[in-house]
Amino acid sequence: MDPSQNPNIVHATTIISVRRGGHVAVAGDGQVTLGHTVMKGNARKVRRLGREGQVLAGFAGAAADAFTLFELFEAKLDKHGQLTRAAVELAKDWRTERRLGKLEALLAVADKETSLIISGTGDVVEPEDGIIAIGSGGSYALSAARALLAHTQLDAKTIAAEAINIAGDICIYTNRNVVVEEL
């Protein structure tokens, strides 16, 4: 959905997850857009989840829906203790509970071994190349990260931050106020 189609819902962001050298980094921009207006430039859309902060997560989409998903996912993570199992259990609930079916958000989650996208339709997708990019600037950030991975020796954290910066130069719903978390 075009972020500007419903001016009453907070939309749009860019989140990327990159793996290199045994490290994983998740980065996100700080812009919150309501319709055609930038409401905030320093939102924190990336956080650590789990008892010991062993999972990194970022969200794109409607902010209230994303916070609901963060809470539900973290509860599954606390219960099952393993990223993939928690994601699958959340997806099962998403498909069976009517109230969850209307959530307009995506989650990008990663631990030391696995990166997953949890979609608004209850799908769980593991990217084949270990890179996740979601949100309005996702394809720009994905392209930048792939190029930087292929042609530089930069670490995962630097690549993730630079990919968000590049997306922020192109996508009007993304800014260059980057938050990065790394494992």
From Swiss-Prot:
GO terms for biological process: proteolysis involved in protein catabolic process. PANTHER family: ATP-DEPENDENT PROTEASE SUBUNIT HSLV, METALLOPROTEASE TLDD. Signal peptide: none annotated. It comes from the Bacteria. The active site is at 13. Na(+) binds at residues 168, 171, 174. It is found in: Cytoplasm. This is ATP-dependent protease subunit HslV. Belongs to the peptidase T1B family. HslV subfamily. Protease subunit of a proteasome-like degradation complex believed to be a general protein degrading machinery. Pfam families: Proteasome. Keywords: Allosteric enzyme, Cytoplasm, Hydrolase, Metal-binding, Protease, Sodium, Threonine protease. HAMAP family: HslV (MF_00248). Its EC number is 3.4.25.2. Coiled coil: none annotated. InterPro entries: ATP-dep_Prtase_HsIV_su (IPR022281), Ntn_hydrolases_N (IPR029055), Proteasome_sua/b (IPR001353), Proteasome_suB-type (IPR023333). Gene3D superfamilies: Glutamine Phosphoribosylpyrophosphate, subunit 1, domain 1.
